[in-house]
């Protein structure tokens, strides 16, 4: 699969290849490679690409140019507001929402595409001209206006493939003089009819005013980011940037204070206005027990942490004090409250408009707290999160950029090795054994999987598909497989740490659930642990591409019977609820420190017992509350099992109660 050069959501006008075809406009996800310009349906709620709707071979493109927008189009060429019926609402011209059209001309006529911004249009035209520059049939004249109602608005010619009416001034392609890649074509002299057309004055092409920075969203970099390819923009922690393009995808286009533009990872930034993420005292994903452990280790009077509360949308201030007479010190947790007027307080008499103002006040005044907030405490190294790919658009990875350092083990698809990308970035390299995977299907789906980005998912970086075996490149996790981690470290875990592992996995699965993406093989063996003990979910969705019948058949020796609900064992019916069942078994694995589920039974006996209603017993490290959560995942009726969102809420409640 060729690397994607550009990827954007545009409005596409129907090409009306038949005279009876309707004129309509649809949002499409456009992808450009060196070989094809393709467009797809796009699911905005799930943030993923849909079915392919069409493509154009790059070698067939003869011209790429802007189009002069039609002024005051009639109602039939206008579109309704999103979500409203056109017969019941004010019509809005298409150019008001996607005001920057351009055309891609090929052997079947012009394809009209509408961009939401002038900058995005310019970039696409530039890249398209770059990839077609060696084409042999580039035209010397084009139509600057739309083809509408059977004719071009600029010259009234009625043949869709009629020669253009305006001469291109060496703008179509970018060949240097004397290039041997294609013969230079001199334009033919105009016919008398064309000469008359050319003498007609054309309507002036509108000039787009540069985007004012006051109209753009301002963000602050949370981490440094060094560009990995030419499309990227460098980030410096604490500096401000302006967002030029924002999407559901994990890369946004931005501009720095010097006017440099490029793509940045969206998980490396936060909104500049009233954001608390940039402050040293804030730890977004820290739990109550982690905060207590860190404050005790620091042992400083007035040490404090501001963290997300277990209650959605709330914050908690955790404070350590020695002055209470307790030899080990005392930790108090204060929920940041708010009034109906959006004023924040810890003590009701002291109200503030923002949380930073609140913290600043209590850094100088205890005002009812166990101690004033003297020392912000945080993890020594707040590691930057993984990016979705090694730079924007970097999908196909060059094997020459990989250095293999050591073998990590052997998985379902082959050997896994630890290595470096370009000598500096840690990666895991899965070398796919030939015949073990449906490779073509995986490669098509992996582009979607790369856009799944969450801090508790092992990030897919890219693939190497131009040789065999193919490689899958992912985030490296230093402590390896969760199952082995549990077995090897079994005497060192406190129950609170085990619950945090469950929370980590549940957060990842809630994210996949929100994207309507199934894992299909959730188990401790398919989760990995990083150097800080954070658990991340791996191999999501890969089981669909296994070619081994012993793995894919429910009666096969390798099928994950012990993690499968009745509807999967009997009917191979996978759903988010079958992932819920598997999560309950994974919780059991964690609290049993890596034991085999149903260890006394064979696979066939296990399947029989599950069908009869047998469920796993409560591990001795699991409290009744924890066991209630895992047991709720094993309801015989799939619809009666909770969602991952509910499970996460229940786990957070237990974390607060048992800490």
Curated annotation (Swiss-Prot):
EC primary class: transferase
Domain SH2 positions: 281-377
Activity regulation note: Activated by phosphorylation. In primary B lymphocytes, is almost always non-phosphorylated and is thus catalytically inactive. Stimulation of TLR8 and TLR9 causes BTK activation. As a negative feedback mechanism to fine-tune BCR signaling, activated PRKCB down-modulates BTK function via direct phosphorylation of BTK at Ser-180, resulting in translocation of BTK back to the cytoplasmic fraction. PIN1, SH3BP5, and IBTK were also identified as BTK activity inhibitors. Interaction with CAV1 leads to dramatic down-regulation of the kinase activity of BTK. LFM-13A is a specific inhibitor of BTK.
The Protein kinase domain, residue ranges: 402-655
Enzyme nomenclature, EC number: 2.7.10.2
Post-translational modification: Following B-cell receptor (BCR) engagement, translocates to the plasma membrane where it gets phosphorylated at Tyr-551 by LYN and SYK. Phosphorylation at Tyr-551 is followed by autophosphorylation of Tyr-223 which may create a docking site for a SH2 containing protein. Phosphorylation at Ser-180 by PRKCB, leads in translocation of BTK back to the cytoplasmic fraction. Phosphorylation at Ser-21 and Ser-115 creates a binding site for PIN1 at these Ser-Pro motifs, and promotes it's recruitment.
Cell location: Cytoplasm; Cell membrane; Nucleus; Membrane raft
Location of the SH3 domain: 214-274
Residues that bear Phosphothreonine: 191
Main location: cytoplasm
Keyword Nucleus found: yes
Disease implication from the record: Defects in Btk are the cause of murine X-linked immunodeficiency (XID).
Subunit text: Part of a complex composed of EEIG1, TNFRSF11A/RANK, PLCG2, GAB2, TEC and BTK; complex formation increases in the presence of TNFSF11/RANKL. Binds GTF2I through the PH domain. Interacts with SH3BP5 via the SH3 domain. Interacts with IBTK via its PH domain. Interacts with ARID3A, CAV1, FASLG, PIN1, TLR8 and TLR9. Interacts with MPL/TPOR.
Protein name: Tyrosine-protein kinase BTK
Organism: Mus musculus (Mouse)
Gene: Btk
